A protein has these predicted regions:
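Short linear interaction motifs
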Residues: 281, 489-495, 571-574
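Extracellular disulfide-stabilized recognition modules
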Residues: 488-506
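Extended repeat- or IDR-based interaction platforms in eukaryotic proteins
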Residues: 448, 464, 558-563, 591
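Peripheral/terminal regions associated with large enzymatic or DNA-binding modules
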Residues: 4-203, 208-489, 608-625
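Short, structured beta-strand segments at or near domain termini in extracellular proteins/domains
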Residues: 576-608
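Folded, disulfide-stabilized extracellular/luminal domains of secretory-pathway proteins
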Residues: 500-578
Length: 625
């Protein structure tokens, strides 16, 4: 047809061919070669899974997801379709082409476990997301099923990729659900570390979005985990991410750490998880784990910007449709590029403590304050150490302002419970640094304002460093972080206090009245009682045969000595505060009796509705109504 056509026809055909070749060349430019990305990387293919959820923008704003994507349109060249190194996704029929780093991990024998029950689609989506991770070939991947019988109809063995090993936990215990999950975790840890002899373990729940670069993150943080014996784990999550700067290199360490995306070495397993399957628990494994870490005086490392995020679905573990939660909007890192975290020696406990002290104490006091920082609240309660009042009297907020390079007028120190002042300061453009002096009694009133976790998370020895509305924010616990505070701001434990155990159904107020004599009167002070709301103090006075467990009653801290399921447990709580005039028939309270001369701090614990009902019932039972 070309040869027989006239000149105009031949010209038309030539133009079409030139345009076609030009578009073909433009498309080819989207396809990388080994030379484009260096010899240290390879191109790997994965079957395309439409059910795998798309990563979001990572800024906590779902509306920004589409705007942040780079779209690759076949046969259309565009300046907006620029390639990012190690961040490539090309529409290929039934295939996704991905650049994967072939750099070998430094871990000797690491494992990843996706832990799930019966959500087949969630499990499979998680498996495919994990198998796409850069460097996953150096990990052994497992799926641990807590409800294997419910998934037989889905032919899990045949559906699972050959690179994945299935663990089945067939448990006769079905209720309560949090006990079944706790037992599943213990089973899985035994399998990974005892039977398969792995050196490190990453645990992922089946409803999480994961950052493509998490294995590089773990490879770097594992070195500090293995080096520092005061560290128990690394977490990929941050409960306070809404109040953090989007600094992908910044890491923290703290107690009351996040419980998602936990990474352990063998030391962590031996210290915590090498136990028999529990037959009873008052709460979930995560509360138990944090309590165990607190007993051991150990902490975990976690990022300012999470490397995982909750999905929001009909049957998600934590976040469900229409539940009002904002967890699925938390910022998290979605970039496929590995982040060089740099020198992590600042996370070693001594270095971390020194940095914090340097922010608050002048050079002449640093060593003294650092020594005070090693004094625990237990030491103060038990008389093993005393408050260094002389040093506290020399502490002032002017050094903190100077250290931050701001005027004192640009810093605002807010005392406990002053919610209205906090709201006002957050919107004040002239304020660059906010220090909140807090206690457990008032944490829940400030947490929603600052978009913090409902319970205290991420504190290191009573201090928490954040950024809200472009302002640096420091929270200081007036009991735990006493060594950083001026004397007037410390909540002191009174050395004249007397600790006593109560009889069943005896309140702390009644204990203190019983202890009083004609020459010495004692009272129950709720602010002093909060000091002994901890496992270490319960174990001083009760046998606690089955250890400590978490509860939310306001008769805490208590020992259960009657023939009920919790017999032999010592119970305490980090989420609620104890009351003086509360008691129940099945427990014995641990009480603090103070002299009337004790300093009156005036903190008033939040009283739960259930507590008010129980107090009325107790008065009826005692014939006081």
């Amino acid at each position: 047809l070309f040869m027989k056509g006239d000149t105009l026809w031949k010209l038309f055909v030539c133009v079409v061919c030139v345009l076609a070749i030009s578009q073909y060349i433009s498309l080819c430019k989207l396809v990388p070669t080994a030379d484009d990305h260096g010899k240290g990387e390879e191109i790997r293919y994965y079957p395309y899974q439409e059910s795998i959820p798309l990563d979001s923008a990572g800024r906590g704003d779902e509306s920004a997801v589409e705007a942040s994507k780079v779209h690759y349109i076949p046969f259309e060249s565009s300046k907006t379709s620029e390639l990012k190194k190690q961040s490539l996704e090309i529409p290929v029929v039934n295939k996704v082409k991905e650049i994967v780093s072939s750099s070998k991990t430094s871990l000797p024998n690491p494992a990843i476990v996706i832990i799930g029950c019966s959500r087949y689609s969630n499990i499979m989506n998680s498996v495919h997301a994990v198998l796409k991770l850069k460097g996953v070939e150096y990990y052994r991947v497992y799926v641990s099923l807590g409800c294997p019988a419910q998934l037989k109809q889905n032919f899990m063995q045949s559906a699972m990729p050959k690179e994945v090993t299935i663990l089945e936990f067939n448990d006769s215990v079905t209720e309560p659900p949090f006990l079944k999950i706790f037992r599943h975790y213990v089973f899985m840890f035994h399998k990974i570390f005892d039977e398969y002899k792995h050196s490190h373990l990453l645990v992922l729940e089946d409803d999480l979005l994961i950052s493509p670069s998490i294995l590089s993150f773990l490879d770097q943080t594992s070195r500090i985990l293995d080096k520092d014996p005061s560290l128990l784990c690394v977490s990929l999550f941050n409960d306070n991410a809404f109040a953090e700067p989007f600094d992908v290199k910044l890491l923290h360490r703290g107690s009351q750490f996040p419980n998602l995306g936990l990474f352990f070495n063998r030391r962590g397993y031996e210290l915590v998880w090498n136990i028999s399957l529990p037959n009873f628990t008052t709460t979930g494994w995560d509360h138990w784990f944090r309590m165990r870490a607190e007993e051991l005086h150990m902490e975990c490392v976690f990022p300012a910007v999470p490397r995982i995020r909750h999905q929001k679905g009909l049957i998600g573990t934590t976040v469900k449709i229409n539940d009002g939660s904002q967890l699925h909007l938390m910022p998290y890192l979605t970039s496929e590029e590995d982040v060089d975290l740099g020198d992590l020696s600042y996370l070693v406990q001594d270095a971390y403590d020194r940095w914090i002290v340097s922010q608050f104490a002048p050079a002449t006091l640093e060593e003294t304050v650092l020594r005070n920082m090693q004094i625990t609240v237990d030491d103060l309660i038990e008389g093993k150490a005393r408050y260094d009042v002389k040093t506290a009297e020399k502490m002032s907020w002017s050094h903190l302002a100077s250290k931050k390079g701001i005027w004192e007028s640009e810093m605002k120190v807010i005392s406990y419970g002053n919610v209205y002042s906090l709201i006002s300061v957050l919107s004040n453009k002239n304020v660059k640094l906010i220090v909140v002096l807090m206690t457990n009694e008032y944490y829940k009133t400030i947490a929603p304002i600052l978009k913090l976790a409902n319970s205290p998370r991420g504190f290191h020895k009573g201090s928490l460093f954040l950024r809200v509305n472009g302002k640096e924010l420091i929270l200081l616990d007036r009991r735990e972080a006493w060594f950083l505070l001026p004397e007037k701001d410390i909540v002191f434990y009174d050395p004249a206090n007397v600790i006593r155990t109560a009889a069943p159904d005896e309140s702390c107020q009644e204990v203190c009245e019983r202890l009083s004599t004609t020459t010495q009167r004692y009272v129950c002070d709720m602010n002093q009682l909060q000091f002994v709301n901890r496992c270490t103090q319960l174990k001083r006075f009760f046998p606690c045969e089955r250890g400590c467990a978490h509860e939310v009653g306001q008769d805490l801290p208590v020992y259960v000595n009657t023939t009920i399921k919790t017999q032999g447990y010592c119970l305490y709580s980090t989420d609620v505060q104890p009351l003086c005039d509360y008691a129940v028939t099945v427990t014995q309270r641990l009480c603090v009796c103070s002299t009337p001369q004790v300093r009156n701090y005036g903190f008033k614990p939040l009283v739960l509705r259930e507590t008010n009902l129980e107090l009325l019932n107790r008065k009826r039972r005692k014939g006081l109504l």
